[in-house]
């Protein structure tokens, strides 16, 4: 039996990859890349400890001890984007939490999977003055995870340098989480790394979605219903957070436009967590598109 324990935030929880729950009238749930990867492991026993909104410190405090009790053969730690929006953002504290989490899992004998987050410059359009501080923080978190991965010898997927990660089909309608295709990409990349490292694996996940991606009408329907509430939430948390970061950088004299690309960069924050948007409704309406 292969015990696979998945720690992290909503990316690992599977948000963006809806599946039907068992039983008549049951509400749809999430699958995600960890479940897809588990299918390619020998006799898998999957435990997803990831939670919505988790930061690095949350993973260390709330998920690590339970993960160690499960004595994992394979463990994943994919986290970081929620950290970027915190007012008390500190690369040193993130490095401490992530280092302790990954180091503890490695010391327990687990093969640990980690990931560099994609470049936050693709989907979510905000002015460059707000885009740059978030891009800078994401870059700092990737540097932290690079150091942690090198120190402990993790299997480290560089999603930031993966061209396929920037295909619009890889993202759900909210543009904040991977779509089923995106989750399959992550699962395939980790599967390939495990195979290359000599870990016994079965067939890799199919790159093609098993569910019909939502069509244009389905996306418009989501925007007209669930999307309206989403816009309101984003207007009262994401935008003020980005404005606050921009103001702090300006006051501290650290705002350097040249360091994070040209003004007007488009942002995509795939790991940013939001309340349950009932995205599965998109799958149900896919045939309408």
For each feature predicted by the language model, list its residue ranges:
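A short helix->loop->beta-strand "cap" motif at the edges of active sites that frequently abuts
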Residues: 107-112, 154
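Conserved catalytic region of serine esterases and O-acyltransferases that act on ester linkages
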Residues: 151, 174-289
């Amino acid at each position: 039996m292969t015990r696979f324990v998945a720690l992290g935030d909503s990316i690992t929880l599977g948000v963006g990859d809806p599946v039907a729950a068992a039983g008549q009238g049951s509400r749809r749930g999430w699958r995600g890349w960890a479940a897809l990867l588990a299918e390619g492991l020998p006799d898998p026993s999957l435990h997803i400890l990831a939670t919505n909104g988790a930061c690095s410190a949350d993973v260390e405090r709330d998920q690590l001890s339970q993960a160690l009790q499960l004595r994992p053969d394979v463990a994943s730690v994919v986290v970081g984007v929620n950290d970027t929006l915190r007012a008390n953002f500190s690369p040193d504290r993130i490095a401490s939490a992530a280092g302790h989490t990954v180091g503890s899992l490695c010391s327990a004998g687990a093969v640990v999977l980690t990931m560099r987050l994609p470049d936050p410059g693709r989907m979510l359009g905000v002015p460059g003055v707000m885009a740059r501080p978030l891009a800078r923080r994401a870059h700092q978190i990737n540097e932290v995870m690079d150091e942690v991965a090198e120190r402990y010898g993790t299997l480290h997927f560089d999603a930031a340098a993966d061209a396929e990660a920037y295909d619009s089909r890889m993202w759900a309608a909210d543009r904040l989480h991977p779509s089923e295709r995106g989750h399959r990409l992550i699962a395939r990349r980790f599967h390939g790394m495990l195979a290359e490292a000599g870990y016994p694996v079965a067939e890799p996940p199919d790159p093609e979605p098993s569910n019909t991606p939502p069509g244009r009408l389905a996306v418009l329907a989501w925007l007209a219903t669930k999307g309206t509430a989403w816009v309101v939430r984003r207007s009262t948390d994401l935008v003020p957070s980005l404005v606050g970061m921009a103001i702090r950088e300006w006051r501290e004299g650290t705002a350097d436009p040249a360091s994070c690309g040209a003004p007007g960069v488009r942002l995509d924050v795939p790991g940013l967590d939001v309340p349950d948007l009932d995205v599965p409704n998109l799958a149900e309406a896919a045939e309408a598109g």
